[in-house]
């Protein structure tokens, strides 16, 4: 059993233990429905965290069954995969929108760093213990038991340390994206030269 209250690697200047907090002290279930003022152009697909307006809805009235999904909110997607055995949470960092009522949406109720929590709640190593005890298996996916989820505990750093960690991983993702683009460009150049430099 790991009783550590601090990570093995930390940024300089941070020495305090991380605080044990119930997730119900950080998030509350949001049941806020779309009042009809948000159109299908603001529909967010949880699987890819993108706006997707080509969803078929029978009527504009049906859009009122959708939940509002604001920046900082998290939603549970119960599909299991090799990477996420019990499903996963995703955080909205793309803009205010709406999601289907099939997703459980939670809203932060304390000050927190958006970037830090994006990485924390999508970290299978951290969330596996939480989700294994707060989900139940159904056909092809897991259902979240809200009360069990909100009763689970999580070690949380100060807001200052959250910001430092969130910024660090956000910067790494930015660098990865830049290098992936360069790699794709080099692959295209190679393909072009392979076609043109041989007779």
Where are these regions (language model features)?
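Feature detects amphipathic, helix-rich regulatory segments
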Residues: 1-199
